[in-house]
Amino acid sequence: MSFLRCVVLLLVLMSNLHAADSRLPVTGGERQWPQASGPQGTWAVGADSVPLKWSVARGEGVLWRTTLPETGQGGIAVWGNRVFLTTLKPEAGQLPLGKDVIGHCLDAKTGKILWTVTLPGRETSVPAYFFSDATSPSPVADGQHVWFFNACGSVGCYDFAGKQIWMREWQPTGGRPFNKQFEPILFNDTLLNMEPRDADDPKREGKDPWNYLRALDKRTGRTLWVADDAMTHYNTPVFGRLPDGTPAVLQGRGAYHGVPELPIGLSLTSLAAGKEGKTIWRYETNRSKACYTMHWNAKYAAWFDIDASEHQVLDVATGKLLRTQSLVKQVDWRRFNPAKGKHELLTGVDLTKQTPPLKVFPAQFCNILLGDWHYFLCYTEASKHLGPPYCVGRVHLETGQVEYLEVPVSIVREAGQPDQFIWNRPQTSSTVNSRGIEVATDKRSRGDGWWWGYLGSPTAIGGKVFFTTMLGITYVIDGRAAVLDERALLAVNDLGHPGRTWSLNSLSFAEGRVYHRSMKEAVCLGPK
């Protein structure tokens, strides 16, 4: 091969690499975790090697642990040698007020807290509320700056030394339980937040204003545009691209407590230059709630109908409903038989004909698309006949095949003792913070997370799906398994001893390490 041809080939390869990188929502973020949804903005990332097993209770696979001064339930941003997360502002000798948020910058190698900043709030959230609180939105980073959020009404931009660049405050919608599940999205120089229209905006609704995607200039905090269609504050929108490369965000409407935004359903909102905030398509329905992470891929978007225990698949190009799939009929259910100490298969069963009849209510915000499968946890509540109990579920987007695998609720790990799995029994978690103060005022926050709470969104790394419950238990599922059986359960990990741990967090992954957190501490996990 001639020298000239070598040069041409190298230029082509570099051009292709640049084109691939330019498709990332955050430039240069392919090896980082710049936002809650990861470098692709989809909560999924490829990886050749990922830590699968750890135990904070035993100190196994733990590179560092850092005590946090107060509770928090947002995700973790990682860029280079910096880790960013938030907690509520601690109050001396008492539980936090749930209004102000502290942004923390940690050293990624040691876990040392390097600096902190305070973000003020205009509303008040319930501390350690098992739906959400002021810390629910995760930080965002781009290698030069980090943006911390307070769901009670502020966002601040800082450089990596902690110097404030700008601060924006706004008035969140109120009058209902807090339940704000929005996760910020960074796309190029545009930072997406969820806010109502400004008070002087002629399009703003009256006494009960709607929420919208609001685009901010990441450099100044100035509003660039507000999306055409509204969204509920319960919803977690997701970034993606259409087959032609058009960048867009899938957002939803419809939730509890009479949220006003209409119509119930989905909107795909464009981020393309010159069409920012415009609606590509809208799917309207009078059923169910948009209380999920709104995953979609190059072919399909998905919607759970919790009233009918059904899964709906939409054409991502048009928003047209393609098919409705039952989550209760002709399903394969692998449940654990404690007498035999192993799983048993019930194949092709109708859950509505069990004793008692079962309904399937996919756990809200605990869902993720991986390939052609939509994975989720199943809410479990005997009095409401919800199940299958303590199961990971998945439904195939094309065939409608549905599988359920029961997993242990918890695990007891003591030094020198074998692991003890706890099956099919409700458990309790602890909402005592690192300073020994009980911070939860709602007793429901002390459950196991398998019923009526908003767990952290699952993350897929290298084809493995990581689910974390309120107990701090993290299940690792082989997302490429041909069959969802006990072999697909790769690990049951912990963030601390059972009954003494609490987490509503998603994990992050960068440079071969997993970053996670509980109420009491942040941890870095991986091989030493």
Model-derived segments and their meaning:
Residues 20-528:
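Noncatalytic, solvent-exposed loop/strand surfaces
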Residues 5-16:
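Bacterial N-terminal signal peptides
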